[in-house]
Amino acid sequence: MKLISTAATLFVCLAPLSASARSISFFDSTQAPIQLETFPVKGDNPLVYCSDPSGNILQIESVDLVPNPPLPGQTLSINASGNLKERVEEGAYVALEVKYGLITLIKQTADLCEQIKNVDLECPLEKGEMTLTKQVDLPSHIPPGKYNVHADVYTKDGKKITCLDAHDIEFKIRP
């Protein structure tokens, strides 16, 4: 009984203070919340640039994924186009991180020239316009849930080719 009356007394004493505190502003009324600028990749895809892409070596014009979002057990069609501002040679690399919710599934650095062989390209990648069309058969046993992908791509000299994120790619249980 004593605990209840102490709590009630505390509430009664703090109620006027909390009522007056609502009218006190710790911030200038003209201040706005911080809004982070995002840089989505054009096309039907879940991709965003990690930061302003204007200084990147690869200027992506568009990326279209069909279906979007990708579905387990189905073929994913990728159509992409862009412009390389300079030649990309052997030694370029990609730092890749894939997460399932908060769990990191993959965190590795890989040779870009080895990886692009999977999409029928090879190094050196010459300066200029490029297109990519690829069909990828997705396994039917992708665990359901939300995935996040982060890829930083650099030349052999450490110059940024591009940096991309894909957030909340959701795979659902197929009926």
UniProtKB/Swiss-Prot annotation:
First and last residue of the signal peptide: 1-21
InterPro entries linked to this entry: Ig_E-set (IPR014756), ML_dom (IPR003172), ML_PG-PI_TP (IPR033917), NPC2-like (IPR039670)
Pfam families: E1_DerP2_DerF2
Gene Ontology MF annotations: sterol binding
Keyword Transcription tagged: no
Keywords tagged on the record: Lipid transport, Signal, Transport
SUPFAM superfamilies: E set domains
GO biological process: intracellular sterol transport; sterol transport
Propeptide: 22-37
Domain of life per record: Eukaryota
Cystine pairs: none
Oligomer and partners: Monomer.
Reported function: Catalyzes the intermembrane transfer of phosphatidylglycerol and phosphatidylinositol.
Annotated family: Belongs to the NPC2 family.
Official protein name in the record: Phosphatidylglycerol/phosphatidylinositol transfer protein
